[in-house]
C-alpha cells in the first residue's frame, strides 16, 4: 500500500531564496518598526505609553523566563541555563509618547540621515521606488526618526554625521578589502553573552550590538580575501580518500556505497541518481552519502549537515544491534541504540515510527528469538539478527550488511522506501534476497565478494585508516604560505596579527576605548565561532563585494574573456556532436560486419537461432521447464538453448529430442512436467520442420559472392539459378526446329 498519496506531512525540499516568495522585496530595504525603550527614573503617566508597556509585558510574560541550551560532550547531553540580567533583556515602560516620536531634540531619538551601514542606519529613499509610492503618505523614511532594535539605557553616544561617501572612503582606507562594505553578520544568544563580557572588561559598556556585528563582518571579509591566496589541499585529500576507498573496495568490498564508483553511491539504496526532490546529501562529519528519502532529510541546511551518529556521538564507536558493521548510515531506536537504515528496511520486524524523518526505529522487541540465534555464513559472527535466503528450501542466513558487502542479490522490486520503512506493501511487490547458490540467472557470481567480506572481518581489528602523506611534504616546502599555520587540523581559520590591527582601526573609527587585548579576544572568539560551525563561513559569500572593487576596464576584460571562452565551448560542443555521430556510425558498422561474418561462418546456426530458439525461449513451455527441471544434465541442454550452442539444425534436433525422451522416462516425474514436456516437444518439432530442409548456403550463394573473408553482393543471380536448374544460354535453331516453330505459329 502506498502511503505517499494519503499523507499530508512535510515534503522533502531545499532552502528557497526569499525573493521566490516576495519578488518585489529588496534585501536592502529597511522595514520601520518602533519598540519601547528601557524605563528611567521618571515615570510617565501617558496612556499611550502605558498601553505599549502593558502589551509588551504581556507578550514577554507568555514566554518562558528561563531559557536553556544543550551541551553535547563525549556523547553526554547536559543543559545549562541561559540567563541575562532582567533589566537588560526585558522591554520596560517607555517614557516617550507617540506624539513625541517626531521630536528632533529628544536625547533618546537618534536621527541617522545617510550611513555606510545600510542594514541599520541607511534609510531607503522610498519615494524613488515605484512599489512604495502608496506608502509615502503614511510613512516618510527620510524625515521620520528611526529606532534600532537594540537601545541602551542611556542616550546613545554614537551619532553618525559623516556622509556615506566619506564613511566608505574611511573604511576603504583601513583595508582595501572593505570597499563597498556592508554588515552581514547576525548576532545570536551566544554573541549577546560575549558582548556583555567585552563591555565589562574592555569597552566600558560602549560597544553596541551594531558595532559588534560590524567587527565580525570585517573578520569574515578579511578571511574571505586571504583564503583565496592560501594553497588548497582539500582536492589532494579528497583524491587520496577516493583512491583509498577504491583500494579498500577491491580488497574487502563495501557495505556503505564507498568505492563502487567515482560518484559515491547512497549508503542505503546504493543508487547514484538524484533529482531536485531527492538529492544525495553528504555528511560533513563521516562523509557518508545518503538520499533525502532514504535517510529522512526534510530540509537541507545552507551550511554543513551531519548525520545522526556524527551529531550525537561522533567520537564514540557506533555498533549496530543487527549486524557487525561499523560503517554506513545509522539511526537510533526508541531505546537509544544504533541500527543501520538498511538493516531496519530489510528486517520485517523493524519499522520507522516517522516515515518522513525515518526515525526512530521501533520493533526491536518483536524480533524473534530464532532470528537472534541465526549464524551468518559470511562473517561467521554470532551476533545481531540475520535474514534468510528467499529460496523455498534454503535456510542460509546472513546479515544485511554482510550480504551488501559480499554482493549477494538483494532487490526491493517496485517497493518504495516509504513502503519498506512501514512494512506496508503488496505481495506482488515483495522484496527478494538470495544466497550465492540461488541467485537469479544473469546475476554475477558472489564467491569473490564473500571471500572479500570474510577477509575484511578477519582483519577488522588490524585495519587502520590510511593518512595522506603529502601534507608533511607540503609543510616542508619553501612556500611563504606554508611557513604560517592558517588553519587548524579541524579546518578552523587562525586569525593573523593583521586582523587585530584592522579591528583596532575600526573601533577607533567609532571613538570607543580601544585596548589591544580586546581586538585579540574578538579574533579568538571569531576563530572559536568558526570551529563551532565546522569551519563554514558565518556570513554569506562576498563575491559581489569583491567584484565591486574592480574597475570598468577590468570588468570588461573579464567579460571579453568569458565571451571568448563561450565561443570555444560552442565549437567544442559541435566537435563532440560530430565525434559522437561518427562513433555511433562506426559502432553500427562494426556490429553489422560482425553479424555478416557470423552468418557466413555458421549459416545454419543463425537460421536456427532466428527461426527456432528465439521463439522457443520466449514461450511459456520453456519457462516452465526451467522451473520444473532439476536434473543437472537436462539443465545443461536448456542453457545451451539459451546461448545457441548448436552448430547445425541436425545436432540441435538430436539433442533436444533426447532431452524430451529423458523427460518422458524420468522416474517420479510430475504430471505437470509431462504435460509441459509434450507441449514443448510439439512446438519444437513444428519449428524445426519449417527450416529442416532449407539449404541456407545455397540461398546465400544466390545473392552474395563469398570468397573466404571477402563478401560481395552478386549483381545478378541469373547465372547461378541457370546452373542450379541445368539451363544453358540461348542456342541457334536447326532447320527442322525452324519448320516446327513456323508450323506452331501458323496454326495459332
From Swiss-Prot:
ZnF (C2HC pre-PHD-type) intervals: 317-350
Zinc finger (PHD-type): 263-313, 374-439
GO biological-process terms attached to the record: chromatin remodeling; DNA-templated transcription; regulation of transcription by RNA polymerase II
Cystine pairings recorded for this chain: none
Quaternary assembly: Component of the NuA3 histone acetyltransferase (HAT) complex. The NuA3 HAT complex has 2 functionally distinct forms that participate in transcription. The NuA3a HAT complex is composed of at least NTO1, SAS3, TAF14, YNG1 and EAF6. The NuA3b HAT complex contains an additional subunit, PDP3.
Function comment: Component of the NuA3 histone acetyltransferase complex. The NuA3 HAT complex has 2 functionally distinct forms. NuA3a binds H3K4me3, through the PHD finger of YNG1, and acetylates H3K14 at the promoter region of actively transcribed genes to promote transcription initiation. NuA3b binds H3K36me3 at the coding regions of actively transcribed genes, through the PWWP domain of PDP3, and coordinates transcription elongation.
Protein name as catalogued: NuA3 HAT complex component NTO1
Naturally occurring in which organism (per UniProt): Saccharomyces cerevisiae (strain ATCC 204508 / S288c) (Baker's yeast)
Gene responsible for this protein: NTO1
